[in-house]
């Protein structure tokens, strides 16, 4: 377990050695719990390592945030695809057993706002901690990926103006406004059974101005965009994400 507000030299060395000791070709995973002492909060994470070593440049990094009520390790279909392309993927647990559950009998807007703010703080802490413990990865160009509430968290973090956040991928986020800036490349993959709140998605003019990519998947259900969803949907999500991250392309659904 990694502890303290900032990693100690001993903890950083231990984590670096643990990662380095894993054969790269195994695309192994490591489970850790970071401790944010300033907020008195534990942050469980899973590091999914690249399937092959990056020899020409540091491996790229993605921080992944799950949808509400879905386990943070239930996006293996996407994580493994990115691992095969040389990415380090850090899956972040924003939902601890001690956290208040969403009360749908009350106004959900302030509850979700609290969850988003907490998630944004989690992402900041995870990035700060891991960039110190294992600087061999590309922490200067981090991609954020998130589904539903995790997408809202990712969108809000990407909108803070941090120059180290350069891309964001959301799976049908509905409340956190996506960034409007050429400094952050945007891909948002949309389900067909939901609607985003006004102002969340860039309009046609903003998409053209900032190069944002909005991919609508016919027949896709919001709650199916994880490991438990149909194979065809997972393949479409992985294809669009890979095109965006690897080829810098915006590929619409067939």
PLM region descriptions:
Residues 2-6, 10-51:
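An N-terminal hydrophobic leader/cap segment in hydrolases
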Residues 93-94, 216-218:
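Residue-level recognition of beta-strand->loop/alpha-helix junctions
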Residues 246-254:
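Alpha/beta-hydrolase-fold serine-hydrolase catalytic core, especially in secreted/extracellular enzymes
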Residues 33-137:
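Serine-hydrolase catalytic machinery in alpha/beta-hydrolase-like enzymes
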Residues 220-233:
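Catalytic histidine-centered segment of alpha/beta-hydrolase-like enzymes
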């Amino acid at each position: 377990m990694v502890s303290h507000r900032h990693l100690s030299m001993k903890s950083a060395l231990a984590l670096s050695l643990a990662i380095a000791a894993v054969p790269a070709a195994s695309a192994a995973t490591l489970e850790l719990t970071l401790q944010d002492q300033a907020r008195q909060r534990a942050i469980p994470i899973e590091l999914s390592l690249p399937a092959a070593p990056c020899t020409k440049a540091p491996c790229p990094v993605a921080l992944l945030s799950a949808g509400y009520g879905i386990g943070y390790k239930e996006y293996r279909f996407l994580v493994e695809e990115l691992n095969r392309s040389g990415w380090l993927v850090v899956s972040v647990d924003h939902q601890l057993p001690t956290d208040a559950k969403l009360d749908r009998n009350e106004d959900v807007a302030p509850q979700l706002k609290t969850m988003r703010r907490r998630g944004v703080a989690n992402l900041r802490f995870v990035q700060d901690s891991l960039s110190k413990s294992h600087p061999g990865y590309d922490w200067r160009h981090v991609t954020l990926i998130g589904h539903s509430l995790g997408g809202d968290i990712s969108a809000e973090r990407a909108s803070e103006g941090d120059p180290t956040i350069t891309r964001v991928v959301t799976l049908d986020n509905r409340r956190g406004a996506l960034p409007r800036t050429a400094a952050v490349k945007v891909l948002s993959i949309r389900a067909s059974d939901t609607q985003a709140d006004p102002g969340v998605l860039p309009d046609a003019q903003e998409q053209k101005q900032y190069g944002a990519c909005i991919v609508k998947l016919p027949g896709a259900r919001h709650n199916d965009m994880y490991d438990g969803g149909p194979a065809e949907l997972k393949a479409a999500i992985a294809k669009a994400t890979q095109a965006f991250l690897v080829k810098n392309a915006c590929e619409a659904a067939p």
